[in-house]
């Protein structure tokens, strides 16, 4: 394969894996540890 193709595939895989990790952190099991500043603030 050409170098440009390998670089494009590598960047695409990196972007997809980062997006998957971000979604897992936001909505998966670690999201229970995140704090919500709107719930902490009382009016």
Curated annotation (Swiss-Prot):
Name of encoding gene: psbN
Listed InterPro entries: PSII_PsbN
Pfam families associated with the record: PsbN (PF02468)
Keywords assigned: Chloroplast, Membrane, Plastid, Thylakoid, Transmembrane, Transmembrane helix
Gene Ontology biological-process entries: photosynthesis
UniProt membrane topology term: Single-pass membrane protein
Function description: May play a role in photosystem I and II biogenesis.
Top-level taxon in the UniProt lineage: Eukaryota
Subcellular location field: Plastid, Chloroplast thylakoid membrane
Membership in a protein family: Belongs to the PsbN family.
Protein's name according to its UniProt entry: Protein PsbN
Gene Ontology cellular-component terms listed: chloroplast thylakoid membrane
């Amino acid at each position: 394969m050409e170098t440009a193709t390998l670089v494009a595939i590598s960047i695409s895989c990196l972007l997809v894996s980062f997006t998957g990790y971000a979604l897992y952190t936001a909505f998966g099991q670690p999201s229970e540890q995140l704090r919500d500043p709107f719930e902490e603030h009382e009016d």
